[in-house]
Amino acid sequence: MSGLVPTAPEQPTEEMENQIKSPTAVPDAPPDYNSHFAPGPAGPVASPSAGLPMGYYIPQQPGAIPLYHPTGGTHPIQYQPGKYPVTNQPAPIMWMAGPAPVPNCPPGLEYLAQLDNIHVLQHVEPLELMTRFETNNRYDIKNNIDQMVYIVTEDTDDFTRNAYRNLRPFVLRVTDCLGREIMTMQRPFRCTCCCFCCPCARQELEVQCPPGVTIGFVAEHWNLCRASYSIQNEKKESMMRVRGPCATYGCGSDSVFEINSLDGVSNIGSIIRKWNGFLSTMVNADHFEIRFPLALDVKMKAMIFGSCFLIDFMYFERPPPRRMSR
C-alpha cells in the first residue's frame, strides 16, 4: 500500500467541462473608454464582467453623464439641450432704415423727408395709474409699417411736473436710432392768472434742429370757439395755420386739427388725435397721426411735428383723478 498514490474520485466528464468553461470570455485587451458621452440607440444589456457577481454596482467612468430614467412611463424629450425657449424677453425694436443725406436738410431730419405720415404713440406710465405722481412723458414715433423713427422724452424736474401739471414748462428731446439728439422742443411757462386773451398768457413752443439752432415757433392765437395756432419760421413770420375742432375732446370720435395755408384756402395736412376707446378716458396714452405732403419742406414738417406736442399738453394732458375722501 505504500507504493499507491491517492487520487481524487473520478468526476463525470460533463461536470469537468462545465468547470473549465467561464460564463463570459475575458477580453484579451482592456476596453477603449471614451470620456465624451455620445447617446445612441439602446442595445442589449451586457452581462457583468468576469469575477463580479450579479447586481454588483460598477462605478461610471469619469466624465460620463448619468442617464435619467423617468418613472411612470416613457416621456419624450421636449427640448434639445441649449435650445430651451426664453420667455419674458421684450420684442426687438424695428427701426426705419437710415436714409441718404438730403441737401439743405438739418441732420436727423432726413427721415421726415421720406415720409408723408407719422404716428405719435405716448407710453403708459404705471406710476401715474397707481399714484397721482406725474412722470416725464415718453413717445414713440413710428411710420405706417410700425418701424421706429424717433424717440421723444420729456426732461422736466419732479417739482415742476407735479406743481404745474399740464401747464408746466417742458423740454422735449428727440433722438434717433443711434441715440443722437437731433431736435429739441421747449415751452416756456405762461402765467394763466391773467385774462386768456392777454398776449402774455398765450402758449408758445420753440423748435430747435439741431439743438441750439431755432428753426421756428408754434404760437397760440386767441379764439372764442376753437383752438387756433400759427406755425412760424425762425423770424416769427407766420407760414401756416392750425385750426382745431370746437370740441377738442370728442368722446367716441377722433379730434382733427387741420393745417391750412394763411389764407385758409388750401389744406396742407392734419393732426389727428385717435380715439382709443375706454383706454383714452382712463390713462394719458394718446395716439396722434400726423399727415403732410411728401414734397413739403422738411423744416415745415418738423414744425408740424412739434405743434402736435403743444396740442397734446394743452388739451389731452389731463391731471390724474383725485381720490374721494371719506
Swiss-Prot record:
It catalyses: a 1,2-diacyl-sn-glycero-3-phosphocholine(in) = a 1,2-diacyl-sn-glycero-3-phosphocholine(out); a 1,2-diacyl-sn-glycero-3-phospho-L-serine(in) = a 1,2-diacyl-sn-glycero-3-phospho-L-serine(out). Residues 1-94 are annotated as: Proline-rich domain (PRD). Residues 1-32 are annotated as: Disordered. Its cofactor is Ca(2+); Mg(2+); Zn(2+). A motif (SH3-binding 2) lies at residues 41-49. Its main location: membrane. A lipid is attached at residues 193-195, 197-198 (S-palmitoyl cysteine). It is a single-pass type II membrane protein; Lipid-anchor. One of its GO terms (cellular component) is nucleus. It comes from the Eukaryota. Residues 1-299 are cytoplasmic. GO terms for biological process: calcium activated phosphatidylcholine scrambling; calcium activated phosphatidylserine scrambling; cellular response to lipopolysaccharide. It holds the Pfam family Scramblase. The chain crosses the membrane at residues 300-316. A motif (SH3-binding 3) lies at residues 94-102. A motif (SH3-binding 1) lies at residues 18-25. GO terms for molecular function: CD4 receptor binding; enzyme binding; phospholipid scramblase activity. Residues 317-326 are extracellular. A motif (PPxY motif) lies at residues 30-33. The N-terminal proline-rich domain (PRD) is required for phospholipid scramblase activity. PANTHER family: PHOSPHOLIPID SCRAMBLASE 4, PHOSPHOLIPID SCRAMBLASE-RELATED. Interacts with PDCD6. Interacts with KPNA2; this interaction mediates the nucleus import of PLSCR4. This is Phospholipid scramblase 4. The gene is Plscr4.
